[in-house]
Design a protein with these regions (language model features):
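Carbohydrate transferase catalytic cores enriched for Leloir-type hexosyltransferases
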Residues: 1-372
Length: 372
């Protein structure tokens, strides 16, 4: 059985979609009778398959979303047929996907549909996604929240299976010693204590500005020495976020790192006093699990998939309520009993999310689809 995996739309492993694909490939265990093969941008020749016995087929397409969409619309069928795939997995269907399929197809959905449709072609893209999802054979939703969102858009619920993403427990685990005064994460030396939030500055729904305001309120109320570290690439909303940080009375205590390598988040989390995650558009919420796995308390939004993912291992707030966010920041620092409970529950919660299970369950779905 030959399974193709489409790496287009995964941002060269510099976003959540790219992290998904990189983690999937890294944790794939070769099995008899199954061959995986990736295809995508020539820029990704070594991005996902380095060190793995998995072939990568470069496709000569310009490195732009519109060019990749055109290729999927006009050329994907011929490519899939030429390479003899029995099935194809599409990890970024919200961004690039054929509108019809002549080979068995599985899409993996890691976000609610509407959050990816804020460009000039939103209406066309929404119709195209619906048409493609109607034609696809199987849909894997990374949370029940995503599954419910798909069903609300009229997608056949019988096509949908929920398979949770994993976290890399070889990377995210409690450190032995966090007693240093600084988190030494090259090229940064971040003074402790601090709160952290890892998210691209991509839009108002990520609630960076609300967090900055809440942090300012926390500082004013408690006079504690904490800093706020926001780690994520600049995006469409970066000017507004930088302006809010600059105008805060505690601007000198707010640090925006820009792009932050995924592997560096483990130390960023473990050396922090807590992960504060106010985003209201998370379909998966892996960052809160990664933070839990490093042994730090988590406070997050009470919306989207975060309550489903966190369970009883976090405290929740309304992301539009600045005082609630600030109060949660204070509680996980001042209330030792709460802090210790969140850490213990979080460590246990994180154990139930692993990539080995994600990969095995996904491949099983493809095998059943191909074999009938």
């Amino acid at each position: 059985m030959k399974i193709g995996i489409d790496s287009f739309g995964c941002d060269h492993a510099r976003s959540g979609l790219g992290t998904y694909l990189l983690s999937f490939i890294s944790n794939y265990q070769k099995e008899d009778g199954v061959t995986l093969e990736l295809f995508g941008s020539p820029l990704d020749k070594f991005t996902y398959t380095s060190g793995k016995d998995i072939k990568f087929i470069p496709v000569n397409v310009s490195d732009s979303l519109n060019a990749e969409r055109r290729w999927h619309y006009f050329s994907a069928h011929a490519f899939v047929k030429k390479h003899g795939y029995d099935a194809v997995i599409y990890p970024a269907p919200e961004r690039v996907l054929p509108v019809s399929f002549k080979t068995r197809s599985v899409v993996v959905v890691n976000s609610v549909i509407d959050t990816k449709l804020e460009d000039n072609f939103a209406y066309f893209t929404r119709k195209k996604i619906r048409k493609s999802f109607d034609a696809v054979d199987r849909i894997i939703a990374a949370s029940q929240f995503i599954a419910d969102d798909l069903i609300s858009h009229g997608i056949d619920k019988n096509k949908i299976t929920v398979i949770y993403n994993g976290i890399d427990h070889k990377l995210f685990y409690p450190p032995i010693d966090t007693s240093d005064d600084f988190a030494d994460i090259k090229p940064f030396a971040i003074r402790k204590p601090y709160f952290t939030y890892g998210s691209k500055l991509s839009g108002p729904e990520k609630k960076h500005i609300e967090l900055i305001k809440a942090f300012s309120l926390f500082k004013e109320k408690t006079k504690l020495p904490h800093r706020l570290v926001i780690s994520g690439s600049d995006g469409e909303y970066s000017d507004e976020v930088h302006k809010a940080a600059f105008e805060s009375p505690y601007a000198s205590e707010i640090f925006l790192t820009g792009f932050f390598p995924h592997e560096s988040f483990a130390k960023l989390y473990s050396d922090s006093d807590g992960c504060i995650f106010p985003s209201t558009v998370e379909g998966v919420g892996l960052p809160i699990l990664e933070a839990m796995a490093t042994g730090v308390p988590v406070a997050c939004s009470s919306s989207c998939a975060l309550p489903e993912i966190a369970g009883d291992s976090a405290i929740f707030f309304d992301s539009d309520n600045i005082e609630e966010i600030a109060n949660c920041m204070e509680r996980i620092v001042v209330d030792e009993g709460l802090k210790n409970t969140l850490i213990a529950n979080g460590l246990e919660r994180a154990k139930s999310f692993n990539w080995e299970n994600t990969v095995r369950q996904t491949i099983d779905i493809v095998k059943k689809l191909v074999n009938g």
